UniProtKB/Swiss-Prot annotation:
InterPro entries assigned: AAA+_ATPase (IPR003593), ATP-dep_Clp_protease_ClpX (IPR050052), ATPase_AAA_core (IPR003959), Clp_ATPase_C (IPR019489), HslU (IPR004491), P-loop_NTPase (IPR027417)
GO biological process: protein unfolding; proteolysis involved in protein catabolic process
Listed name of the protein: ATP-dependent protease ATPase subunit HslU
Organism (species): Burkholderia mallei (strain SAVP1)
Keyword terms of this UniProt record: ATP-binding, Chaperone, Cytoplasm, Nucleotide-binding, Stress response
Predominant cellular place of this UniProt entry's protein: cytoplasm
UniProt subunit comment: A double ring-shaped homohexamer of HslV is capped on each side by a ring-shaped HslU homohexamer. The assembly of the HslU/HslV complex is dependent on binding of ATP.
Presence of the UniProt keyword Chaperone in the record: yes
A GO-annotated cellular component: HslUV protease complex
Role played: ATPase subunit of a proteasome-like degradation complex; this subunit has chaperone activity. The binding of ATP and its subsequent hydrolysis by HslU are essential for unfolding of protein substrates subsequently hydrolyzed by HslV. HslU recognizes the N-terminal part of its protein substrates and unfolds these before they are guided to HslV for hydrolysis.
Cystine connections: none
Cell inner membrane is among the record's keywords: no
Length: 447
């Protein structure tokens, strides 16, 4: 679990997302409250439930990006899913309980990796021993006394020399034959609606087939060391302990990001079949968000303390179109702002992995130096903003379309211009995009 303060979390998010200070603060405080709750004494700790967040804002302003970056910072079980994937129980499609099942799978994988890192050093030593046993088989006993001791000393000295060479990577490309444990057979079974639990049991039954069998393989020492380290680390793990920790981690620290929640609202009150299904998904989500117990293959999982962050553009609907019970489960509401020309400029150059840096790095692989003048950046931002205003407003995603069109010729002919420099100024931008951006009909299809 992350121990970062809200200010540190916001600072990390600022490296990748421009603006949206209110949304960043809300998720930073929510994430910090997870840690604060763990410091509270037990009787009161159970009573402190997370305050779920509803993020409202137009498409392309950073809602999903905040979730993606938060997942990396959280150091906790985190899942991002689209609400549109789910249907009411009884309809064809996934039911909402699968959210928790997917989250527990993520947690088990996360917990297993954490536990394996703890024993990695010891597992590496054991893996090295197994490789050295193949390279230097133990000599037969030659008798007793001084001669046997001398042979053992020689063997140990040779073994240490080879271990040193192995650690320095001098033997990486040498091939050896090893008995390597086969991974369990993977089998995917399509689950009929409402029968996910039974399908999960069948899948786990088949997954045990073939596990534990060994196969003789010829591999390079570099690969052998990795395979044997993983095998030795897995032997040291207690699977039951991993499962218990994973379930506890989900229950206490789990975070679910529900994207596109506005798409399951009732947009009118005519009560068509689609409306019934959408309301049904909301009703199914309600106990999950409120706190319930879900049966998974790793045991029962309580959702009382899982944090839910929902987001939606709410173009055609309003948050008040959600059923009242669900509205009440998202007490913190944050509105994200539409992007301005200044924001577009910052997105192009100010973030850690900005679009400009990405394209410069891509073309540098062909020895083409791409330079952006300040007036070129400004003009590019103005065109993206203007096209958004005249056509559909898709936020920062418009920049991808505009910059792709701008660099179309440069990217195509990069191989012929090795060693050259290309400067993108306002005149270049106008030449490449001017006509297209002015013609509204054309910009609808091209930009």
């Amino acid at each position: 679990m992350s121990t970062m303060t809200p200010a540190e979390i916001v600072s990390e998010l600022d490296k990748h997302i421009i603006g949206q200070a209110k949304a960043k603060k809300a998720v930073a405080v929510a994430l910090r409250n997870r840690w604060r709750r763990q410091q509270v004494a037990e009787p009161l700790r159970q009573e402190i439930t997370p305050k779920n967040i509803l993020m409202i804002g137009p498409t392309g302003v950073g809602k999903t990006e905040i979730a993606r970056r938060l997942a990396k910072l959280a150091d906790a079980p985190f899942i991002k899913i689209e609400a549109t994937k789910f249907t009411e129980v009884g309809y064809v499609g996934r039911d909402v309980d699968s959210i928790v099942r997917d989250l527990i799978e993520i947690s088990v994988k996360q917990t297993r990796e954490t536990e394996m890192r703890k024993v990695r050093s010891k597992a590496t030593d054991l893996a090295e021993d197994r490789i050295l046993d193949v390279l230097l088989p133990q000599p037969r006993a030659v008798g007793f006394g001084a001669s046997a001791e001398h042979a053992n000393d020689d063997n140990n000295a040779t073994r240490q020399t080879f271990r040193k060479r192995l650690r320095e990577g001098q033997l990486d490309d040498k091939e050896i034959e090893l008995d390597i444990e086969q991974p369990a057979v993977g089998m995917d079974i399509m689950a009929p609606p409402g029968m996910e639990e039974m399908t999960e049991q069948i899948r786990s039954m088949f997954s045990n087939l073939g596990s534990g069998k060994k196969q003789r393989r010829k591999v390079k020492i570099r690969e052998a060391l990795k395979l044997l380290t993983d095998e030795e680390a897995a032997k040291m793990l207690n699977d039951e302990e991993v499962k218990t920790k994973a379930v506890q981690n989900v229950e206490q620290n789990g975070i679910v990001f529900l994207d596109e929640i506005d798409k399951i609202t009732s947009r009118n009150h005519e009560g068509g079949g689609g409306e019934v299904s959408r309301q049904g998904v909301q009703r199914d989500l309600l106990p999950l968000v409120e706190g319930t117990t879900i049966n998974t293959k790793y045991g029962m999982v309580k959702t009382d303390h899982i944090l839910f962050i929902a987001s939606g553009a709410f173009h055609l609907a309003k948050p008040s179109d959600l059923i009242p019970e669900l509205q009440g489960r998202f007490p913190i509401r944050v509105e994200l702002d539409s992007l301005s020309v200044k924001d577009f400029e910052a997105i192009l150059v100010a973030t850690d992995a900005s679009l400009v840096k990405q394209y410069q790095a891509l073309l540098a692989t062909e020895d083409v130096k791409l330079e952006f003048a300040d007036d070129g950046i400004r003009r590019l931002a103005e065109i993206a903003y203007a096209v958004n205003e005249k056509t559909e407003n898709i936020g920062a995603r418009r920049l991808y379309t505009v910059i792709e069109k701008l660099l179309e010729e440069v990217s195509f002919a990069a191989g012929n211009h090795a060693g050259q420099s290309v400067t993108i100024d306002s005149a270049y931008v106008d030449r490449a995009l001017g006509e297209v951006s002015k013609d509204e009909d054309l910009s609808r299809y091209v930009l």
